[in-house]
């Protein structure tokens, strides 16, 4: 039986601090919002309010750059 945090084998993306240790492997399809995803290989999704585009190099709320007048979530 695969480790519960091994997203590649379980096809379940776990985006919380509970998956920070051994056996945690997320594939490219694993997308999490916020900076709480401790799983290696997990892609963090940057969301801006309204119809704003997110800047490049976003790894979480602290590095999310949105268009002027837009808030980052």
Curated annotation (Swiss-Prot):
Residues that hold Cd(2+) 2 according to the record: 19, 24, 39, 42
Expression induction or repression: By cadmium.
Keyword Nuclease: no
Residues holding Cd(2+) 6: 54, 66, 70, 72
Binding-site positions, Cd(2+) 5: 48, 52, 54, 58
Binding residues annotated for Cd(2+) 4, in chain numbering: 46, 58, 64, 72
InterPro entries: Metalthion_mollusc (IPR001008)
Keyword Membrane on entry: no
GO molecular function term, any single one: metal ion binding
Keywords of the record: Cadmium, Metal-binding, Metal-thiolate cluster
Binding site for Cd(2+) 3: 26, 30, 32, 42
Residues holding Cd(2+) 1: 15, 19, 32, 37
Job of this protein: The metallothioneins are involved in the cellular sequestration of toxic metal ions.
Subunit comment: Monomer.
Protein family: Belongs to the metallothionein superfamily. Type 2 family.
Protein name: Metallothionein 10-Ia
Lineage, highest ranks first: Eukaryota, Metazoa, Spiralia, Lophotrochozoa, Mollusca
């Amino acid at each position: 039986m695969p480790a519960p945090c091994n997203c590649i084998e379980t096809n379940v993306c776990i985006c919380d601090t509970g998956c920070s240790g051994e056996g945690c492997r997320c594939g490219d399809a694993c997308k999490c919002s916020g900076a709480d995803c401790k799983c290696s290989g997990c892609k963090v999704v940057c969301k801006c309010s309204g119809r704003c585009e997110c800047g490049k190099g976003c790894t979480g709320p602290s590095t999310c750059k949105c268009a002027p007048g837009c808030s980052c979530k």
